[in-house]
Amino acid sequence: MTASRSPATDLPKSWDPPAAEYAIYRQWVDAGYFTANPASDKPGYSIVLPPPNVTGSLHMGHALEHTMMDALTRRKRMQGYEVLWQPGMDHAGIATQSVVEKQLAVDGKTKEDFGRELFIEKVWDWKRESGGAIGGQMRRLGDGVDWSRDRFTMDEGLSRAVRTIFKRLYDAGLIYRAERLVNWSPVLQTALSDIEVNYEEVEGELVSFRYGSLDDSGPHIVVATTRVETMLGDTAIAVHPDDERYRHLVGSSLPHPFVDRQLLIVADEHVDPEFGTGAVKVTPAHDPNDFEIGLRHQLPMISIMDTRGRIADTGTQFDGMDRFAARVAVREALAAQGRIVEEKRPYLHSVGHSERSGEPIEPRLSLQWWVRVESLAKAAGDAVRNGDTVIHPTSMEPRWFAWVDDMHDWCVSRQLWWGHRIPIWYGPNGEQRCVGPDETPPEGWEQDPDVLDTWFSSALWPFSTLGWPEKTPELEKFYPTSVLVTGYDILFFWVARMMMFGTFVGDDDAITLDGRRGPQVPFTDVFLHGLIRDESGRKMSKSKGNVIDPLDWVDMFGADALRFTLARGASPGGDLAIGEDHVRASRNFCTKLFNATRYALLNGAQLAELPPLDELTDADRWILGRLEEVRAEVDSAFDNYEFSRACESLYHFAWDEFCDWYVELAKTQLAEGITHTTAVLATTLDTLLRLLHPVIPFITEALWQALTGNESLVIADWPRSSGIDLDQVATQRITDMQKLVTEVRRFRSDQGLADRQKVPARLAGVTESDLDTQVSAVTSLAWLTDAGPDFRPSASVEVRLRGGTVVVELDTSGSIDVAAERRRLEKDLAAAHKELASTTAKLANEDFLAKAPPHVVDKIRDRQRLAQEESERINARLAVLQ
């Protein structure tokens, strides 16, 4: 933009990420680059940010997800799309209410001391004071979201959407109230969703006891359970219909030892006749499998616990006991009657625990509100079957269909105060009415006290954030959203629910634009990423102590380094293992790019029209041809959400080809007065920085502005085909030159010659190998000088190339300090031995081999092999120096 500017002075001598990144991000936001305009005539591209919990902070999984979404939106913006990346946060019902209740408890208060309305005001106060941490973290990562549209799932607009769809589902008969089994938290006093339950292996006891006769003289059946207290609610005993041992008992009954109740013996396919005694106790009100058996056989469903997990209403001596105390008391009472057959302690089994409060959840029969999912799940499944929504990778499709084709009705009510209040009102005589957003409840009626599951409102996120149920320009421009980026671990919990609700309202006038387009799905693509694991391949968890705060790495290495590490490891559906060494390597990559650009600018790199191809050097034609190949590779990778492939291609081109070779060759060309070299340097850097920008936006912005003087990479054009094909003849010459230089450098290293120490040399076979044009490059990059009249070769290197063999004769006499070289080699040998011992010990550790993922073991084996080769090479060199 400014002809008189001095690009080299626009850059500091080194890159300081913390200071530079903050200033650059502020410039982007102030310039409005991320603000979406629904009135634009550009094609629309939109992504909704999976809303993080308002109580939380961004973890490494968020950082991965945000990096990929930011990369996609930045690229599309550069490709000429009107881009909306919609930010927002989830109200996180249970988590948020728990945080505020804990704050009240510090002062000895409970939410009941304030009442519902005052307590909710306190939650809003907390949200306003403490709910902004995530926004700051997103800015540190470089998220290019439209902050002007930041949403919250409890905003009035989103609340209206919740009430609207609830009313429509209710009127369609798809929401109903019923007593069914739920995950119940006795501590939180509410039902929980499946995702709020963590399963942990615990040591318990397996108690086998007899129903019926105490000896073998009369009818009896032995059953086993880890929750013996639930036998107070048993209403049947189930056996397999083909089990000959019990066939004569099916249809009869056995008495309950503590209550006046007969237990019906039923035949059910669910029972595994090979497991245990082949008979199971059936407690329909306290076990999911038993509940299904109870429905099939129309069994009584007797709840034996109150909401706090205490035995209640059984009419036994156990009433009032905590469930765990009752477990001991019931076992002792059975033993006193002589009914205990066997007790296994410890017995390791999986038990569901409340994610938030930590206690074992209690499957419990409870009166709740439910969504009838059969037709909704079918529509969600059909959207993928019909290709309206494409799941990436396609290998995840079977899991998707297995879930949506066998989905159970969804419990959507929660016994909380914080959340979307269920819009059902009750009259004085038991009347019930669903009140829509534009309706007024009758005078004197009372609203249902429960709130909706957090997942209910987040299921509306793709269209509620765009203004639904109103008709808005945003819905017209940006809906359906282009892609959903999320973890495969919540494919069913969140993605399926968004698909169900999205297809349910897909033919709504606000979405079809009054019929101007057909029914829509919430997103065109679903990209599922894997989980972040530590460098040993273990899942990150607080209990393992291996959780890493992404901002710690941002502070240490910069946001670009973290982003490149995550994107480079991200393949569709695959988990990625990362450690500090990976981020340090990415930081080094950024430094390499910075130094190469700074060198180019200091040497006059400037964008200009390139001369005809036949006037370019072999090196020029090679780097420009490779650049075009990499551009096409990166485009293909991004189009298929293959972030790892894109980053690997860019990394190896930038480091191995451009920085390590072309920049060095450019120095030779500039020394020879080849003036167009500066234009080739600038052209290559210009395209490379544009291609890298979606993943490492900060450093590329600074470098590109210094290179071009233009406003911002954010709004620059994405590279298009240059039309420059890879020149095969030039490429072969460069390949041969690289091999020749590499072999000479390896020989020099083995001889103990210092880098850049000039050595007289004579080359033979150059013309026959078609390398006449590369002699100056070989001489410069291999640190050789011309052989003088007194040249006496002391060594030679033969390098077989495609067109022939080049012999390099060298005079190394007097160039080596033998004693110093021995000291250096001995030091290197000690390091190689240490690495060899370390890797060998790891590979001999059976526990490590059993637990570590295959790719981690392979890396250790590679390190062991390299250490062995290095040790052998050094020993050979030491032998020569004897």
From Swiss-Prot:
Short sequence motif named 'KMSKS' region, residue ranges: 539-543
GO molecular function annotation: aminoacyl-tRNA deacylase activity; ATP binding; valine-tRNA ligase activity
Keyword Transferase tagged: no
Binding site for ATP: 542
GO terms of biological process kind: valyl-tRNA aminoacylation
Gene3D superfamilies: HUPs, Isoleucyl-tRNA Synthetase, Domain 1, Valyl-tRNA synthetase, C-terminal domain
PANTHER family: VALINE--TRNA LIGASE, CHLOROPLASTIC_MITOCHONDRIAL 2, VALYL-TRNA SYNTHETASES
Family matches, as NCBIfam families: PRK05729.1 (NF004349), valS (TIGR00422)
Protein name: Valine--tRNA ligase
Organism from which the protein derives: Mycolicibacterium paratuberculosis (strain ATCC BAA-968 / K-10)
Organism placement in taxonomy: Bacteria, Bacillati, Actinomycetota, Actinomycetes, Mycobacteriales
Gene name for this UniProt entry: valS
